[in-house]
Amino acid sequence: MMKPLRQQNRQIISYIPRVEPAPPEHAIKMDTFRDVWILRGKYVAFVLTRESFQRSPAFSVPESAQRWANQVRQENEIAD
């Protein structure tokens, strides 16, 4: 007799994908900068453009990450 492929009474977990690359749960938001998060010891900016986030490269100083975010906002003409 073959075993069933999955446990019969186990609930199926529904997965809702996030809009990537959104700031992950373990990222720490910097209060002094609008778009800058601390991620693995580096500074990363996340900018919401239309329906998706754009993620910056990792910077060693938060000002650089914010400058990148400001440029992306200007390029996409995001209104506040």
Swiss-Prot record:
Record keyword Phosphoprotein present: no
GO molecular function, one term: DNA binding
GO biological process, any: cell division
Keywords: Cell cycle, Cell division, DNA-binding
Cytoplasm as UniProt keyword: no
Gene3D superfamilies: Cell division activator CedA
InterPro entries named among the record's database cross-references: CedA-like_sf, Cell_div_activator_CedA
Stated role: Activates the cell division inhibited by chromosomal DNA over-replication.
Family: Belongs to the CedA family.
Name of the featured protein: Cell division activator CedA
Organism: Salmonella typhimurium (strain LT2 / SGSC1412 / ATCC 700720)
